[in-house]
Amino acid sequence: MNNSPQRAAKGFTRAFWVSNTVELFERMAYYAVFIVLTIYLSSILGFNDFEASMISGLFSGGLYLLPIFSGAYADKIGFRKSMIIAFSLLSIGYLGLGVFPTLLEAAGLVSYGATTRFNGLPDSSSRWIIVPILFILMIGGSFIKSIISASVAKETTEATRARGYSIFYMMVNVGAFTGKTIIDPLRNVIGEQAYIYINYFSGAMTVIALLAVILLYKSTHTAGEGKSLREIGQGFMRIMTNWRLLILILIVTGFWMVQQQLYATMPKYVIRLAGETAKPGWIANVNPFVVVCCVSF
């Protein structure tokens, strides 16, 4: 019996398609910014390599840790409310990344153009305001990581789930590819200011996603199903006592530590090695390109 609302072609609901579409926009926004985050922190805000890598690393680590808690809360309040919260926070965060340098320039601490000229910003505590801005992004992103994949699971049946997740990962990687494609031509046109303006693009993508959720997303699933903090803690302790699972987690963690260098260190390395005409976005796009080409297989 079909009890899912507004079930569309090939067994998928409208909520499924909306979820995947906003995931596409969110991934475009995320990767457009994340591929140059460490460069933004150094070239726009004046952080040295160590400071930039620490801020970027803590941001990335928190983004993967917080879904343990935000996912449980999302189950309690429902996917629609969670998506609205997530995309609202992401929009504020990305637009904040764009506006913040303008405020620093207005204060006389820096001048932006094809190249950046610092007028005391590297010695100013004002640049650390970036941390709460990134924290807002971290919270919003942590909701998305748990919501969309769970929504795909809820909006598919046993017969359509495999294809549903193929579509989901296709959207993830199309978004990743598109987002990372934008920054290199933008750098060629306006220089280092591209690291500022790319945030407005990401903000626009998450605002579009927010409007899509508000206007189009309807689902009857997963309100009031979340676990309590005690249940989350009990589950965590069970994981910590399962040594086979811990070994698997360590192996997977090692892979992601290496993979994250595509964003943490590779862009700076490539630009410093090959010059300002280098295209780190295209190098990082090898991964999503291969996934998109092979996902159907």
Where are these regions (language model features)?
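Glycine-rich segments within core transmembrane alpha-helices of 12-TM secondary carriers
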Residues: 63, 162-187, 203-206
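Central cavity-lining transmembrane alpha-helices of secondary-active solute carriers
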Residues: 57-72, 286-297
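Intracellular juxtamembrane helix-capping segments at the cytosolic ends
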Residues: 143-157, 270
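Juxtamembrane intracellular "pre-TM" segments in multi-pass secondary transporters
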Residues: 1-13, 222-250
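C-terminal ends and interior cores of transmembrane alpha-helices
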Residues: 88-124
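Short amphipathic helix-loop junctions that connect adjacent transmembrane helices
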Residues: 35-51, 264-281
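Symmetry-related core transmembrane helices of the 12-TM Major Facilitator Superfamily/SLC fold
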Residues: 131, 196-215
